[in-house]
Amino acid sequence: MELENIVANSLLLKARQGGYGKKSGRSKKWKEILTLPPVSQCSELRHSIEKDYSSLCDKQPIGRRLFRQFCDTKPTLKRHIEFLDAVAEYEVADDEDRSDCGLSILDRFFNDKLAAPLPEIPPDVVTECRLGLKEENPSKKAFEECTRVAHNYLRGEPFEEYQESSYFSQFLQWKWLERQPVTKNTFRHYRVLGKGGFGEVCACQVRATGKMYACKKLQKKRIKKRKGEAMALNEKRILEKVQSRFVVSLAYAYETKDALCLVLTIMNGGDLKFHIYNLGNPGFDEQRAVFYAAELCCGLEDLQRERIVYRDLKPENILLDDRGHIRISDLGLATEIPEGQRVRGRVGTVGYMAPEVVNNEKYTFSPDWWGLGCLIYEMIQGHSPFKKYKEKVKWEEVDQRIKNDTEEYSEKFSEDAKSICRMLLTKNPSKRLGCRGEGAAGVKQHPVFKDINFRRLEANMLEPPFCPDPHAVYCKDVLDIEQFSVVKGIYLDTADEDFYARFATGCVSIPWQNEMIESGCFKDINKSESEEALPLDLDKNIHTPVSRPNRGFFYRLFRRGGCLTMVPSEKEVEPKQC
């Protein structure tokens, strides 16, 4: 019914706009949900957590923030942090400004007249850096050795002092909270957005923070029937491993009675297939296509850095966020390639598989560069290179075209666009752009990307050429999304529990910590950034009393009569739509 779709969309849009609660979608009980434990309760975590400087002080967002707050209390350490921040700004500076920016950093931090220089960085390293900055086109990595020395200094005695500070105790409190169990009640659930191989995808919202996600539900019986345990666990582990601005992130993994759930970055702008074929004439202008291609190149580079080949590049797997940036989604066919090895597998989608995949030959990352060529072609031309949109043709015929035919180019393509497509769609993988030893760096150097500053792109500092309508829901109507049939004859037993335990591991550190910071919950709770007190309770004999909800007269009356059992009160009633 049309009414059902309107209601489902209205609830989703209201949730996206922070329509529930006073704090952008937070539950009325968000502070109770995010209550930090006394420090004494974190003693086991203090001893068991790996004391890795890079992870605790740089990669993990809350750890990075608290380590910097600690450094701010000591002038020498604060100076090092200011230097590292200045270098980060240098690395994303425009090419024409980079030399002046770098020389000003040297003058600011290594001037002989300074009262607070950085003596830990040797003069010869500074001199070499200065010479590099005076070149015509200074490298973005001119300060690489300086930053390495600075981090080596911070990972020594300063890191040890940090571990004895109240800031590290606060970090442990947040890590304790991060490791608490995740259930379906952690979220509000909204309308179905689509469906995958093992189940549906619906929108959801974290009650504590108001953060919106997409929940991919893998039906347990369907997984077991299709023997998909390895595939499901592989996708989960790859998503957990990859932290990229250009690949959907896994934030939570949990289970219900009937499903295994992956909670992923929600992409409200729809997929590229919808935008290519449903908004005006098929295809994009070249500027827009090149921008998306640049972001895809960065995403593939991040995957290949972890030795992962994606193998399923196609428009419906590329999603747009609220601002119009893209991310690669659906990593069900991705696989990790051991160092020095190659893999074989005829997997992918008809019309997008590379010749070496069609021929069932061994490969590493070459299929993804072929896939990028297919996508660039389709974004500009308005159909894929070897199969027109909605063309009725057998898959065997499409495979023959991929192996034997040469793609045709219309007037829509500039010479640079033709060039990169031809180089990426080279039949021989050893001669294909990106596969000749240069990897993503070689693809980025193609003239079609001459106007793209990749450093600024990777830092999320470039505006996309298109911004989705924030009041639109870019997916099929609820009733147009085909529902799964009931799986019969499959029974779950205790033998399946080991697999479920390996899958349902709760929060993923970096996305969860980013959520706490971006939602403002970290700022509101953390004593260093607000006036609210933290339960730092360094005395192990002090215990924080558990607050109990106020009970009414009739509750107390029936309680005395033994008619009631103790259950948590739930005062908030919130919409639920799925």
From Swiss-Prot:
<keyword id="KW-0007">Acetylation</keyword>
<feature type="active site" description="Proton acceptor">
    <location>
        <position position="312"/>
    </location>
</feature>
<dbReference type="GO" id="GO:0097381">
    <property type="term" value="C:photoreceptor disc membrane"/>
</dbReference>
<dbReference type="GO" id="GO:0009966">
    <property type="term" value="P:regulation of signal transduction"/>
</dbReference>
<dbReference type="GO" id="GO:0008277">
    <property type="term" value="P:regulation of G protein-coupled receptor signaling pathway"/>
</dbReference>
<keyword id="KW-0418">Kinase</keyword>
<feature type="modified residue" description="Phosphoserine">
    <location>
        <position position="485"/>
    </location>
</feature>
<dbReference type="InterPro" id="IPR011009">
    <property type="entry name" value="Kinase-like_dom_sf"/>
</dbReference>
<keyword id="KW-0597">Phosphoprotein</keyword>
<comment type="function">
    <text>Specifically phosphorylates the activated forms of G protein-coupled receptors. GRK4-alpha can phosphorylate rhodopsin and its activity is inhibited by calmodulin; the other three isoforms do not phosphorylate rhodopsin and do not interact with calmodulin. GRK4-alpha and GRK4-gamma phosphorylate DRD3. Phosphorylates ADRB2.</text>
</comment>
<dbReference type="GO" id="GO:0022400">
    <property type="term" value="P:regulation of opsin-mediated signaling pathway"/>
</dbReference>
<dbReference type="InterPro" id="IPR044926">
    <property type="entry name" value="RGS_subdomain_2"/>
</dbReference>
<feature type="binding site">
    <location>
        <begin position="193"/>
        <end position="201"/>
    </location>
    <ligand>
        <name>ATP</name>
    </ligand>
</feature>
<dbReference type="InterPro" id="IPR000961">
    <property type="entry name" value="AGC-kinase_C"/>
</dbReference>
<dbReference type="InterPro" id="IPR000239">
    <property type="entry name" value="GPCR_kinase"/>
</dbReference>
<dbReference type="GO" id="GO:0005737">
    <property type="term" value="C:cytoplasm"/>
</dbReference>
<keyword id="KW-0808">Transferase</keyword>
<keyword id="KW-0564">Palmitate</keyword>
<keyword id="KW-0963">Cytoplasm</keyword>
<dbReference type="Pfam" id="PF00615">
    <property type="entry name" value="RGS"/>
</dbReference>
<dbReference type="GO" id="GO:0005886">
    <property type="term" value="C:plasma membrane"/>
</dbReference>
<keyword id="KW-0067">ATP-binding</keyword>
<feature type="modified residue" description="N-acetylmethionine">
    <location>
        <position position="1"/>
    </location>
</feature>
<dbReference type="InterPro" id="IPR000719">
    <property type="entry name" value="Prot_kinase_dom"/>
</dbReference>
<dbReference type="GO" id="GO:0005524">
    <property type="term" value="F:ATP binding"/>
</dbReference>
<protein>
    <recommendedName>
        <fullName>G protein-coupled receptor kinase 4</fullName>
        <ecNumber>2.7.11.16</ecNumber>
    </recommendedName>
</protein>
<dbReference type="InterPro" id="IPR016137">
    <property type="entry name" value="RGS"/>
</dbReference>
<dbReference type="GO" id="GO:0005829">
    <property type="term" value="C:cytosol"/>
</dbReference>
<keyword id="KW-0449">Lipoprotein</keyword>
<comment type="subunit">
    <text>Interacts with DRD3.</text>
</comment>
<dbReference type="GO" id="GO:0050254">
    <property type="term" value="F:rhodopsin kinase activity"/>
</dbReference>
<feature type="region of interest" description="N-terminal">
    <location>
        <begin position="1"/>
        <end position="154"/>
    </location>
</feature>
<dbReference type="GO" id="GO:0007165">
    <property type="term" value="P:signal transduction"/>
</dbReference>
<keyword id="KW-0547">Nucleotide-binding</keyword>
<dbReference type="GO" id="GO:0004672">
    <property type="term" value="F:protein kinase activity"/>
</dbReference>
<dbReference type="GO" id="GO:0005938">
    <property type="term" value="C:cell cortex"/>
</dbReference>
<feature type="domain" description="AGC-kinase C-terminal">
    <location>
        <begin position="450"/>
        <end position="515"/>
    </location>
</feature>
<dbReference type="InterPro" id="IPR017441">
    <property type="entry name" value="Protein_kinase_ATP_BS"/>
</dbReference>
<dbReference type="Pfam" id="PF00069">
    <property type="entry name" value="Pkinase"/>
</dbReference>
<feature type="binding site">
    <location>
        <position position="216"/>
    </location>
    <ligand>
        <name>ATP</name>
    </ligand>
</feature>
<dbReference type="InterPro" id="IPR008271">
    <property type="entry name" value="Ser/Thr_kinase_AS"/>
</dbReference>
<feature type="domain" description="Protein kinase">
    <location>
        <begin position="187"/>
        <end position="449"/>
    </location>
</feature>
